[in-house]
Amino acid sequence: MKKARRSPSRRKGARLWYVGGSQF
């Protein structure tokens, strides 16, 4: 969730770790 602070929603890979970090 630390990387989520960057809010890199513009990146394609961001959605991968963003969703995984939220659930895990």
UniProtKB/Swiss-Prot annotation:
Q: Where are the transmembrane segments?
A: none
| Subunit architecture | Interacts with F protein.
Q: Where in the cell is it found?
A: Virion; Host cytoplasm
Main localization (coarse): virion
Q: Which InterPro entries match?
A: Microvir_J-like
Described by its record, this protein's role is as follows: Mediates ssDNA packaging into virion, it locates to the internal surface of the capsid, thereby displacing the internal scaffolding protein B during virion formation. Protein J binds to and is packaged with the viral ssDNA. Additionally, protein J plays a role in viral attachment efficiency to the host cell.
Entry keywords, A to Z: Capsid protein, DNA-binding, Host cytoplasm, Viral genome packaging, Viral release from host cell, Virion
Q: Lineage, please?
A: Viruses, Monodnaviria, Sangervirae, Phixviricota, Malgrandaviricetes
Please identify the protein, giving its name as recorded: DNA-binding protein J
Q: What's this protein's family per the entry?
A: Belongs to the microviridae J protein family.
